[in-house]
Amino acid sequence: MQRMIQQFAAEYTSKNSSTQDPSQPNSTKNQSLPKASPVTTSPTAATTQNPVLSKLLMADQDSPLDLTVRKSQSEPSEQDGVLDLSTKKSPCAGSTSLSHSPGCSSTQGNGRPGRPSQYRPDGLRSGDGVPPRSLQDGTREGFGHSTSLKVPLARSLQISEELLSRNQLSTAASLGPSGLQNHGQHLILSREASWAKPHYEFNLSRMKFRGNGALSNISDLPFLAENSAFPKMALQAKQDGKKDVSHSSPVDLKIPQVRGMDLSWESRTGDQYSYSSLVMGSQTESALSKKLRAILPKQSRKSMLDAGPDSWGSDAEQSTSGQPYPTSDQEGDPGSKQPRKKRGRYRQYNSEILEEAISVVMSGKMSVSKAQSIYGIPHSTLEYKVKERLGTLKNPPKKKMKLMRSEGPDVSVKIELDPQGEAAQSANESKNE
């Protein structure tokens, strides 16, 4: 490493016709402006005596003069980052020929020292010299602040040397010294191909640190360069997480949509009718028959009628309202006033149960809250129906008021709700009261 720095320092001092210290090349890598400036300065003695003063003079030069000198001495392919990318992907024949001749001079024809890729003494120049330049160009394209991204040239050479030593150790352990000599060109091509992929992936990974400042210290560059598969591992981990989520998705069931209404009706009405059987002193057969009448459709009711007529008879005898349940289902009737399927927690009742609850409350046998707990009808609904039939509503509906004026108030409303003739009997009871 020291020999490489001394070689670069010797070429730099021979270009400027001065004897500077070998620690002088610790300037930035993109030294096109500072390199050309000492050519135009006349007091070279002050620069040779004081390196700090030489740096100040190099920084205070006139920029238009530096631009003209740089255009006359440099090639556009060496300064333009876009052209440099094209040169990296397809190295010219001259660079490959120089890689096999370490004794050849590393300066170009115009006297300006070349890139750090030309200072590889062991022939592996093109594969190891590309990364610092490519990384610097990639970060300049990604961030836009090229002045803060200039890597020190000595640091870039050190990084290249570390990468070279690690690659040599890994290849020497697998191939041996003879294999290392025979497969030199293959290592160059493979190393350059491996650097072509981390060039873009490394830029994507370094975009996260934009707010913290851009790459002033890149001591972690060899680690990130060798572990170029880190973004791929992160993407693979994300894909594995998505696969795990997709495999575990059948566990997340939509329970409210799957939940059946009849099951909740059975669990709730079982308690309600068992409580009613205890209060009214009825048998368990009557509670079971009430539940079956409320839940089962027409066909199953007919089969139950054929199977057990005794239970239905006992239920008819011990009915609280004195009115037997009809065998027809309210939802199955074509002339029903409620064609829509009932929804909600408290709408698991039909018009038959509602009529029975209304008649019981109007006859004074039960209160509204007691009928709510027994029949499963909401308190507000039951109270509204009772007040509507008694004519004690504060704001009665207009349509039903017209019907009340034309016909009897209770008879007309109950004929609308229950067209099977049972409403007339309950209406007569309410009139007598």
Swiss-Prot record:
**GO CC terms on record?**
nucleoplasm; nucleus
Which residues mediate DNA binding here? 368-388
Quick one: a GO biological-process term for this protein? Answer: negative regulation of transcription by RNA polymerase II
Protein name per UniProt: Ligand-dependent corepressor
Nuclear localization signal (motif): residue ranges:
339-345
Tell whether Calcium is among the UniProt keywords.
no
> Gene for this protein?
LCOR
Subcellular localization, as worded in the UniProt entry: Nucleus
Species of origin: Homo sapiens
- Low complexity: compositionally biased ranges: 36-48
Compositional bias, Polar residues, is annotated for 13-34, 93-110, 316-329
